[in-house]
């Protein structure tokens, strides 16, 4: 029986989680909460500038969405405590507003009747951070109720960092994510607490911070203090790429590094990590459902122990599929 899911925040990630859930028989979205009317939500769900028209019948009945004949309750509550998830049978809430990333705030969904909360972002004081393919085995249904799915960039980096560390040992590394612009930037020059993000997103390459590299330690504790990095926001609407330069414990060749990554992509990390030897560009990865695709043509090694690994990710679609996978995994372990 499908687990019943509510989505709080029907923005870029919320709607992409919904799209991903439509393809997963183990997930049933029964309600969404957003401070917008149902007609607007229906239009934005059906028509997407990045991912195209949704292959589903979408309409509105009163204040609710109707997708492929199934009615989905639409709420418009500012405070999660007032959502009464329990009354409508919601088991798991996907918290994707970006506003309730502290445990005490996200836990209000539990008070409203949900059994588990998945925060679709890095969180503070969460019960556990999980990256699928890396540390989902650490999930304890009795102890973990507010779970972070980390960031899209951590979901890209952690799987191949795991492979590199297990096979060759990572001494230290620096990561740059060349990242498409997001809603946390300004479309034209306007005030922002980060003065670089205050600048027009489509007009510049914008250096900014990311906690993604350090956050790998939350799912791979053995890498604590060994990774750091930054972001370069670029004028594309979707798809990003991680560039990791790391010092390894063992001497390697390009062929050995690629062979290890390819084996993982075809084996234990299939569906999470992919491997490509084609000369592709970012547009080719739009719609990719995996967390990370190794660009094997870009792998480099200097002096045996210094390695560069480049990996692509659809920072919307891939990440949203992992949110859905995590919800299904949590449900499979018992709520």
Swiss-Prot record:
Entry's Gene Ontology cellular component terms: cytoplasm
KW Oxidoreductase (keyword) present: yes
Active site: 152 (nucleophile)
Top-rank lineage group of the source organism: Bacteria
Protein name: Glyceraldehyde-3-phosphate dehydrogenase
Subunit structure: Homotetramer.
Recorded catalytic activity of this chain's protein: D-glyceraldehyde 3-phosphate + phosphate + NAD(+) = (2R)-3-phospho-glyceroyl phosphate + NADH + H(+)
SUPFAM superfamilies: Glyceraldehyde-3-phosphate dehydrogenase-like, C-terminal domain, NAD(P)-binding Rossmann-fold domains
Pathway linked to the protein: Carbohydrate degradation; glycolysis; pyruvate from D-glyceraldehyde 3-phosphate: step 1/5
Subcellular location(s) per record: Cytoplasm
Family as reported in the entry's similarity comment: Belongs to the glyceraldehyde-3-phosphate dehydrogenase family.
CDD domains named among the record's database cross-references: GAPDH_I_C, GAPDH_I_N
Keyword tags: Cytoplasm, Glycolysis, NAD, Nucleotide-binding, Oxidoreductase
Name of encoding gene: gap
Organism placement in taxonomy: Bacteria, Bacillati, Bacillota, Bacilli, Bacillales
Effect of residue 190 to A: In mutant D32G-S, a strong alteration of the affinity for NAD is observed. In mutant B-S, the recognition of NAD is slightly affected
Function recorded in the entry: Catalyzes the oxidative phosphorylation of glyceraldehyde 3-phosphate (G3P) to 1,3-bisphosphoglycerate (BPG) using the cofactor NAD. The first reaction step involves the formation of a hemiacetal intermediate between G3P and a cysteine residue, and this hemiacetal intermediate is then oxidized to a thioester, with concomitant reduction of NAD to NADH. The reduced NADH is then exchanged with the second NAD, and the thioester is attacked by a nucleophilic inorganic phosphate to produce BPG.
Organism: Geobacillus stearothermophilus (Bacillus stearothermophilus)
Annotated residues for binding of NAD(+): 12-13, 34, 78, 120, 183, 315
Pfam family, one: Gp_dh_N
């Amino acid at each position: 029986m499908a687990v019943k899911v509510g989505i709080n925040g029907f923005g870029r990630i919320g709607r992409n989680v919904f799209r991903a859930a439509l393809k997963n028989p183990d997930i049933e979205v029964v309600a969404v909460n957003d401070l917008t009317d149902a007609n607007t939500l229906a239009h934005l769900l059906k028509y997407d500038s990045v991912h195209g028209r949704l292959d589903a019948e979408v309409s509105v009945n009163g204040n609710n969405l109707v997708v492929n004949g199934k009615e989905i309750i639409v709420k418009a509550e500012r405070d999660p405590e007032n959502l009464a998830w329990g009354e409508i049978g919601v088991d798991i809430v996907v918290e994707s507003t970006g506003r309730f990333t502290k445990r005490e705030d996200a836990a209000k969904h539990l008070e409203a009747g949900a059994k588990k909360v998945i925060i679709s972002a890095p969180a503070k004081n969460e019960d556990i951070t999980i990256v699928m393919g890396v540390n989902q085995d650490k999930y304890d249904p009795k102890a973990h109720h507010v779970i972070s799915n980390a960031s899209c960039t951590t979901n890209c980096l952690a799987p191949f960092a795991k492979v590199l560390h297990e096979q060759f040992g990572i001494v230290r590394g620096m990561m740059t994510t060349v990242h498409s612009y997001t809603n946390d930037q300004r479309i034209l020059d306007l005030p922002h607490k980060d003065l670089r993000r205050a600048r027009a997103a489509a007009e510049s390459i914008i250096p900014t911070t990311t906690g993604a590299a350090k956050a790998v330690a939350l799912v791979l504790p053995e890498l604590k203090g060994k990774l750091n990095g930054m972001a370069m926001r670029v004028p594309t609407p979707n798809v990003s790429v991680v560039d990791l330069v790391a010092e390894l414990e063992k001497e390697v060749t390009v062929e050995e590094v690629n062979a290890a990554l390819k084996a993982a992509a075809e084996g234990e990390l299939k569906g999470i990590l992919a491997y490509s030897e084609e000369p592709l560009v970012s547009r080719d990865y739009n719609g990719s459902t995996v967390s990370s695709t190794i660009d094997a043509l870009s792998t480099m090694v200097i002096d045996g122990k210094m390695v560069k690994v480049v990996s692509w990710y659809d920072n919307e679609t891939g990440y949203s599929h992992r949110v859905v996978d995590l919800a299904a995994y949590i449900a499979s372990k018992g709520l």
